[in-house]
Amino acid sequence: MELPLAFNDQLFIQLTVNGVTLGSLYALIALGYTMVYGILKLLNFAHGDVYMVGAFIGYGVLSGLGGPLSPDLALAPLVLLMFLAAMLGSGLLGVVIERFAYRPLREAPRLAPLISALGVSFFLQNSVLLLFGAQFRTYNSFVLGSSNPEVFEPGPLIDPVFKIRGVNVQLIQLIVLLVTVGLCVALTLLVARTRVGKAMRATAYDREGAMMMGIDTDRVISFTFFIGSVLAGAAGVMFGLLFSQVFHFMGFLAGLKGFTAAVVGGIGSIPGAMLGGLLVGLTEAYASGYFGGRWAEVVVFGILIFVLLVRPQGLLGTPELKKV
């Protein structure tokens, strides 16, 4: 007997592909949350807006180099330039945010950095709103020949689709997965094998002890913000390439889902952030496919509440020991 469409194996595999793609973006965002929390015990709620700024930097590169200014530029080097500009710009933005919004408040009551983070978030959203307007901006309108940013060209910028046993896999989905895996491997090697990685781990374990050992903890913290923001910038560009549109408010919900991924996986744990991102992406895809898009956020944030109640340290996190 043939199962109804909602329970079809083919649909399940398609949703899994979509969920892994989404989860890759959430994992990159979650890594920024978890790295900063691991070192400062600070929740950087402006992180989602750094992701949004990265997406708009990619849009700026595309509109300048992919449109009338250089119409013959090949797509591959153009996409590479978008990634490099967005990652560098987002990384520098993260350093500036740490220096001026968080560093002066390190010894302040814990509520002060949270309020500062919300202020930075609103500042970034409204700055992008003033620069680009409230309408959706589309990545592929320039490449496809339209110079009007209000023209919506549906579909991803990188279009080819492979059909594998009836399941559609877009080339951009493969690119997102490969880039995410590459960045996660690079981050893991950075933290585990390099001097700066050892300094990051020492600072996370005991900041005062690290200072006594001669580690410049201010520089380490700035570098941590830089790396987390670089990953968010890459995720922002991949969102634009995947969904073809960016908007000034896109960082809010993506930031919340990235935070959810970090908490579910175990905030402060790098492998936990990666696992949490995949779980949140898969949950969102399955909920949308089987119950309708309006249920996606309900299920995702319901899981966040459940994890906080049952295992507050997350799946791969460790309980914090209080010193007496």
Regions found by a protein language model. Name each.
Residues 1-29, 57, 68-82, 108-112, ...:
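Membrane-interfacial amphipathic/re-entrant helices at transmembrane-helix boundaries
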Residues 2, 10-11, 131, 205-212, ...:
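Cytosolic-side transmembrane-helix boundaries in multi-pass membrane proteins
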Residues 7-25, 169, 190-195, 221-261, ...:
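Inter-helical junctions in multi-pass inner-membrane proteins, predominant
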Residues 12-63, 96-112, 264-270:
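Single transmembrane alpha-helix segments in multi-pass membrane proteins
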Residues 22, 165-246, 270-275:
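Helix-loop-helix "hairpin" substructures at the membrane interface of multi-pass membrane proteins
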Residues 38-46, 92-138, 190-197, 202, ...:
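Short loop segments and helix-boundary regions at transmembrane helix junctions
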Residues 69-120, 127, 275-280, 284, ...:
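Alpha-helical transmembrane segments within multi-pass membrane transporters and channels
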Residues 104-105, 113-193, 220, 286, ...:
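Transmembrane helix-bundle core of multi-pass membrane transporters
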